Each structure stands twice: as structure tokens, then as C-alpha cells.
């Protein structure tokens, strides 16, 4: 959804509940088109889910860089999400406080956390994908605080199916992203063990 200019962003925030749902580091050679002027973003990008205030079934999306994202968050009061950065040499940064912020980190189930990182890396790999994509549904389910301490059996099956439809294994994705990128290590041994114990066929490697 086009969002260039502060005044337009203010009007959009009157019409939509504009909530950030992800913030991702772009790797070498990858770009995302900004909705604030159709320019290529080359560093990091933020995804917003925009829900109509008059029809909650109507969703739009905004993909933008940090400057525009900070402006939207100042208007709405939401927090800028933590940056997902899969690289070794930079540290993830956090947003400022606001709606949706918390003072303490939730205690993740370790299998769920590994699967969550897998999902974030898939989104990083795919880039400019629609927010109604199944992978975003899985992301929302995994980060739901009501279930964050539980094993993600359903979501594991969903990720497996998603990878099959991509015709990629998670190992393939890691190998592709390692080209020209100092990618940090992403473990998924706990997910594999859980799948084996529950007789779930895997498409991770």
C-alpha cells in the first residue's frame, strides 16, 4: 500500500490499524521494493499488516525501510520489532517501547524457538512475499504468547509442507543464503529429534 509522505501515513493510520509484523535484514544481492516510493530497499525492511478499521476482514500491507517504519510506529504507538539478522558480524537491534512491547522475554519451548528461527530464515530467503502467505500464518502461531512454551507439532507439519511446496529443503535454503553472506549457524537438531520421536517425515535436510 503506497505510503510516501508523513501526511499520507497519518491518513492511512486513521483508516487502518497498521501493525508491524516483522523486521528483516536484507542479505547481499537481495532487495525489497518499498511502498514509500517504489524504491529498492537494500539494508533492512519492515512489514506492516494494515487492517481496515471499518472492515476487519480487509487487509493491506506495507513494506518499507526503517525511516518510514519509525514514522508509522510513532503515529500508531506500536513498537518497532526486533531485527532478525542472520549474519555473524552484526547484532540484532530492538525497537523503542510502545504497544506490543514487553519488559521480559517469554520463555520459549526450545523446539518451538528453533522452528521459529527456521520460519524467519525462510521469510528472509523468499523476500517480498505476501502477508497472507501461509508462512506468515505459521509465524503468528509460533509467537503467540499463550502457546510459546508448548511443542509446535502442528506448525512443524505446516513448515514441512511449505518446504515441500517450495521444492526446497531447509539445508538448501541455508546453502543458498551462505553464498556471499557470513551466515551464522542455525541449529535445528531439536526439531529433527522431535519429528523422529513423533514419526513425522521431515523435509529439512
Model-derived segments and spans:
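Extended, alpha-helix-rich binding/interface surfaces that flank or overlap catalytic cores
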Residues: 1-205
Amino acid at each position: 500500500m503506497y505510503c510516501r509522505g508523513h501526511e499520507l501515513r497519518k491518513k492511512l493510520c486513521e483508516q487502518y490499524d497498521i501493525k508491524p509484523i516483522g523486521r528483516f535484514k536484507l542479505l547481499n544481492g537481495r532487495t525489497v521494493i518499498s511502498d514509500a516510493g517504489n524504491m529498492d530497499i537494500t539494508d533492512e525492511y519492515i512489514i506492516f499488516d494494515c487492517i481496515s478499521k471499518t472492515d476487519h476482514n480487509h487487509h493491506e500491507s506495507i513494506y518499507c525501510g526503517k525511516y518510514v517504519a519509525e514514522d508509522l510506529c510513532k503515529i500508531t504507538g506500536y513498537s518497532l520489532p526486533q531485527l532478525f539478522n542472520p549474519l555473524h558480524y552484526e547484532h540484532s537491534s530492538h525497537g523503542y517501547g510502545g504497544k506490543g512491547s514487553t519488559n521480559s522475554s517469554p520463555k520459549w519451548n526450545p523446539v518451538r524457538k528453533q522452528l521459529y528461527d527456521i520460519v524467519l530464515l525462510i521469510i528472509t530467503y523468499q523476500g517480498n512475499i505476501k502477508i497472507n502467505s501461509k508462512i506468515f500464518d505459521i509465524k503468528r502461531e509460533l509467537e503467540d504468547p499463550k502457546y510459546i512454551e508448548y511443542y509446535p507439532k502442528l506448525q512443524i507439519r505446516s513448515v514441512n509442507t511449505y518446504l515441500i511446496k517450495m521444492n526446497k529443503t531447509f539445508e538448501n535454503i541455508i546453502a543458498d543464503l551462505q553464498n556471499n553472506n557470513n551466515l551464522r549457524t542455525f541449529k535445528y537438531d531439536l526439531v529433527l529429534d522431535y519429528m523422529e520421536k513423533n514419526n513425522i517425515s521431515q523435509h529439512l535436510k
